[in-house]
From Swiss-Prot:
Its main location: cytoplasm. The J domain is necessary and sufficient to stimulate DnaK ATPase activity. Zinc center 1 plays an important role in the autonomous, DnaK-independent chaperone activity of DnaJ. Zinc center 2 is essential for interaction with DnaK and for DnaJ activity. It comes from the Bacteria. Zn(2+) 1 binds at C150, C153, C203, C206. Belongs to the DnaJ family. It is found in: Cytoplasm. Its cofactor is Zn(2+). The keyword Repeat applies. This is Chaperone protein DnaJ.
Amino acid sequence: MAKRDYYEALGVARNASDAEIKKAYRRLAMRYHPDRNPDDKAAEEHFKEIQEAYDVLSDARKRTAYDQFGHAGVGAGASAGPGGHGFEGGSNFGDIFGDVFNDIFGAAAGRGGRRQAYRGADLRYNLDLTLEEAVAGTTAKIRIPTYVACKACEGSGAKPGTSPITCPTCGGHGQVRMQQGFFSLQQTCPRCHGSGQIVDSPCSTCRGEGRVREHKTLSVKIPPGVDTGDRIRLTGEGEAGESGGPPGDLYVQVQIKAHSIFSREGDALHCEVPVSFVAAALGGELDVPTLTGRAKLKIPAGTQSGQVFRLRGKGVSPVRGGSAGDLLCRVMVETPVNLNQEQKELLEKFEASMNRNKKHSPKHHSWLEGVKRFFEDMKF
């Protein structure tokens, strides 16, 4: 007895989505589950049938093989890869009926056949942005090599002025059935590849493929706050599908260029602010850059090199909304260089006036005491 068509078993169309297949399976599984139908052999067999159908149709690779070759494509020894056109292993329906099937339909498949409709490939584009562009948002123009729908035939693959016709091999059903003795085998039509239509006069521009290779320019809106690693999906902007299939998607991968002043960590910005040792000692107010203009940074007297000061709200606003991050300014005290004689003498007088008082340089004196104890303990 021939196996029932898997789509028919689940009560769904051949173009049903994964969600529709799952919904149909759950409904039928609840209805025919053996626990709900004890001692009901018919319900048990029905449950096994829908389980087998779901196992195949819920797996993308198996579903593709089934759509191409029917039950033989997913039986024992069948090649599981989508687009695989052979069978491996021991005897199966493909081995039994393969030659007979090809004798009947093989010649017709080579004349006026139609390519199977395939979804276009997804594309990826790496987009380099400046930090300013990433923080403020921008519109970027990109140019990508891709397949686009053939304008001459509008993606149908048929010669302009003509249209695909009903497949004479399967009568537009997309499936053909072979009977050999007690066995019946249903196969995807080898001439129209399951579409039910064929292109009798292919388009000369795209050679019946329904798409051509060219460059495409797009304007991509970049939202404020994007960061390296963020990905923007442009639905339907990937490669055009083959033979009228749906297009793929374009994924724009964001990469932020290095900045001469700022570094970024999440929503926070970091920068180094060099100050003179006099300004660090006396304290004061400094002008520091932000991505929105100048800002005032107050540093207290006695500021040490490496201290970090926070300017709230001067960082990056999150891409999904919310309060802006902070700008963290690391003070780097700069030692003066290229001193003239007068300047050197002034510094020497300044050093003498300090009189090595602990209160002026507590860390230095603490370090000296630590070194002294170290040498005493080591008995150098």
